[in-house]
Amino acid sequence: MNKLPHETRVVIGMSGGVDSSVAALLLKEQGYDVIGIFMKNWDDTDENGVCTATEDYNDVIEVCNQIGIPYYAVNFEKQYWDKVFTYFLDEYRAGRTPNPDVMCNKEIKFKAFLEHAIALGADYVATGHYARVAYMDGEYKMLRGVDDNKDQTYFLNQLSQEQLSKTMFPLGELKKPQIREMAKEAGLATAAKKDSTGICFIGERNFKDFLSNYLPAQPGVMQTLSGEVKGKHDGLMYYTIGQRHGLGIGGNGDPWFAVGKNLKENILYVDQGFHNELLYGDEVIATNVGWVSNKAKEKEFKCTAKFRYRQEDNKVTVQIVDENTVRILCDEPIRAITPGQAVVFYDGDECLGGATIDEVYRSGKKLDYLG
């Protein structure tokens, strides 16, 4: 027998932002037994000695007091360092462009936090993510959030049946302007707080400065694939495939873009033109595959895929190589497919799962210059 809301304990992860504040408010209004948890994943004292986590936690305290729910802070710094930040540095060291948000959701928010919540007697965990969970045909499905502009299933692609069975996304049916309005109407302390952007542990800091604290920069040559030297780069880790800004190449003609990396010789490859053929791939090998249903649909199937967060859906055919690897054949060549990033699969609104981009091909030839 299903429990009534007031008998159902929901532990919600609260960041001190407007989204998780409204998610907590909605759960409370729906009658659930709600506990707010602030996750401290990073020691983020800035140059002025101000710890933004302290400010965020103070906002959580204020909102929880306004809503009338208990709150706690939990420190996951060690798990975060071991599972997310170490991966982040390893990928950059290997010349790739990682996606720490995907790893954070997999290892921290829906693993360490979920385990902690269950220890607190939780029936469910909740977050302020823009996504939906539906139980259909005997399994849990993850659907895109109604707000196309804010949908976050791309970052949640590694969640499993077990995790989804214990997860609530109260904002999934709402759009951002509605959430701001609800926060305002309820007089929540976070109603006008601006959204956080970028990688959580970098915050407002300069990316180059931050990364150089952990990985020594190794400047090198910037050249075309044919060997024409165009300048110097500050370190391969500071550049991603398709990047235009920060190259410092002047002159006439089309703008210059980073098109590849040679890790062995520490060369950044560049070329001209947004639609330069060197930036396009039509086949991908991806590893670390995770399926929301815990299994692939078939050995080969058609669906759509996103190769980065802010991207239209692309029609693809997915071929299962083994339980950890897929081959993705794109209907049309796609620009700036980047090793290390997530590729996420969809069937309409349903997120099927995702994987990590490993190798990129064009017309059957591996693009070795991608690093």
UniProtKB/Swiss-Prot annotation:
Tree of life domain: Bacteria
Keyword entries, A-Z: ATP-binding, Cytoplasm, Disulfide bond, Nucleotide-binding, RNA-binding, Transferase, tRNA processing, tRNA-binding
A GO BP annotation: tRNA wobble position uridine thiolation
Main location: cytoplasm
EC number(s) per entry: 2.8.1.13
Localization (cell): Cytoplasm
Signal sequence segment: none
Reactions catalysed: S-sulfanyl-L-cysteinyl-[protein] + uridine(34) in tRNA + AH2 + ATP = 2-thiouridine(34) in tRNA + L-cysteinyl-[protein] + A + AMP + diphosphate + H(+)
Stretches the record annotates as Interaction with tRNA: 150-152, 308-309
UniProt-annotated stretches for the region Interaction with target base in tRNA: 99-101
InterPro entries: MnmA-like, MnmA-like_C, MnmA-like_central, MnmA-like_central_sf, Rossmann-like_a/b/a_fold
Pfam families to which the protein is assigned, alphabetical: tRNA_Me_trans, tRNA_Me_trans_C, tRNA_Me_trans_M
MF terms in GO: ATP binding; tRNA binding; tRNA-uridine 2-sulfurtransferase activity
Record-level GO cellular component terms: cytoplasm
Active site (catalytic residues): 104 (nucleophile), 200 (cysteine persulfide intermediate)
This protein's record includes keyword Protease: no
Matching PANTHER family: MITOCHONDRIAL TRNA-SPECIFIC 2-THIOURIDYLASE 1 (PTHR11933:SF5), TRNA 5-METHYLAMINOMETHYL-2-THIOURIDYLATE -METHYLTRANSFERASE (PTHR11933)
Function: Catalyzes the 2-thiolation of uridine at the wobble position (U34) of tRNA, leading to the formation of s(2)U34.
Family note: Belongs to the MnmA/TRMU family.
Protein name per Swiss-Prot or TrEMBL: tRNA-specific 2-thiouridylase MnmA
Organism of this sequence: Bacillus cereus (strain ATCC 10987 / NRS 248)
Classification of source organism: Bacteria, Bacillati, Bacillota, Bacilli, Bacillales
Gene: mnmA
